[in-house]
UniProtKB/Swiss-Prot annotation:
This is TSSK6-activating co-chaperone protein. The keyword Chaperone applies. InterPro entries: SSTK-IP. Interacts with HSP70. Associates with HSP90. Interacts with TSSK6; this interaction is direct and recruits TSACC to HSP90. Residues 1-12 have a biased composition (Basic residues). Belongs to the TSACC family. One of its GO terms (molecular function) is protein-folding chaperone binding.
Length: 125
């Protein structure tokens, strides 16, 4: 039993959909600070003299964003590994279906292990 996902050509078994990890929603963050043009210069001086948080200070928003990025990166790594496994399985199937062709005479290029996947960081919490 398969269900259609948001992509019309992609079918995902219901079991896989149930196990899918939802991606974190992005939180809006200001890209710059809006300073009022009518602000007196003293306000600017006050901003400079305020005590900045220490390096060890980690706001909850940053930690939440980092956790989302971490989870998304883990998911992307897992998907890339699954895609490589599918490609390797496909290559093995094609090789079995084409008897009499040597590996040197094959019209399909051999899949070599992707060096990028071998050097993916192993994340641990």
């Amino acid at each position: 039993m398969e269900r259609h996902t948001s992509h019309p050509n992609r079918k995902v078994p219901a079991k896989e959909e149930a196990n899918a990890v939802p991606l974190c929603r992005a939180k809006p963050s200001p890209s710059y600070i809006n300073l009022q043009a009518s602000s007196p210069p003293a306000t600017f001086l006050n901003i400079q003299t305020t005590k900045l948080p220490s390096v060890d200070h980690k706001p909850k928003e940053c930690l939440g964003l980092l956790e989302c990025m971490y989870a998304n990166l883990q998911l992307q790594t897992q998907l890339a590994q699954q895609q490589m496994a599918v490609l390797e399985h496909l290559q093995a199937s094609v090789t079995q279906l084409a008897p009499g062709r040597g590996s040197n005479n094959s019209s399909l290029p051999a899949l070599s292990p992707n060096p990028l996947l071998n050097h993916l960081p192993q994340f641990s919490k």
